Regions:
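Gly/Ser-rich oxyanion-binding loop with an adjacent helix/lid
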Residues: 1-94
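C-terminal nucleotide
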Residues: 74-182
Length: 182
């Protein structure tokens, strides 16, 4: 097939331009050759594979899932092969808010090594506790042993773990607030 694509998403801006393109191609192929049988989650997973292998970017699945599923969603990646996706209905306009996307002027196109370091460092923290991924580490145990973890894995790995725990808590709180109209 031939396709001409035009986008206003700035490449390398952190707005998931590659994920949006991967999902677009996945949806086209799904419609042309699979009769729409491929799920949004599978299209996202295929897009992640393309991101990792073709583009050489060590991305997770979040950007592709957001592009593929669409709308405001909560995604639990505890099982990356079977993520739990929950649509979050919230009418920003009805509440007097507007959700905006801005161009920060920052380009992250050359940060591949930094992105690749994230899962490595988070897995190092998990390994300290005998786990494979940070999701399986008890947060209270992490904080009880943070000094030892820091000696073994380094400052940046500890900061990433703290960020991981804080973000997971924040997201759950925000989803609850949106559902409650708060």
């Amino acid at each position: 097939f031939e396709a001409k694509v035009r986008s206003t998403v700035l490449p390398g801006s952190g707005l998931s331009s590659s994920a949006a393109f991967e999902v677009l191609i996945g949806r086209i192929l799904n419609g042309l050759f699979a009769g729409g049988a491929v799920s949004a989650i599978e299209i996202a997973q295929i897009g992640q594979y393309a991101e990792n292998v073709y583009y050489g970017k060590p991305s997770g699945l979040m950007d592709q899932m957001a592009s593929s599923v669409g709308g405001l969603v909560y995604i639990d990646f505890a099982d990356p092969k079977n993520p739990i996706v929950e649509k979050v209905d919230y009418d920003f306009a009805h509440s007097g808010y507007t959700l905006c996307t801005i161009d920060s002027g920052a380009d992250h196109a050359d940060l591949t090594d930094e992105y690749a370091a994230m899962p490595v460092e988070m897995k190092a923290v998990a390994a300290f506790f005998g786990k494979e991924v940070l999701h399986d580490v008890d947060e209270a145990a992490f904080y009880r042993h943070v000094a030892e973890v820091r000696k073994v894995t380094g400052d940046r790995a500890v900061l990433r773990a703290i960020h991981f725990f804080n973000e997971n808590r924040r997201v759950k709180s925000q989803v609850r607030a949106l559902k409650d109209g708060d």
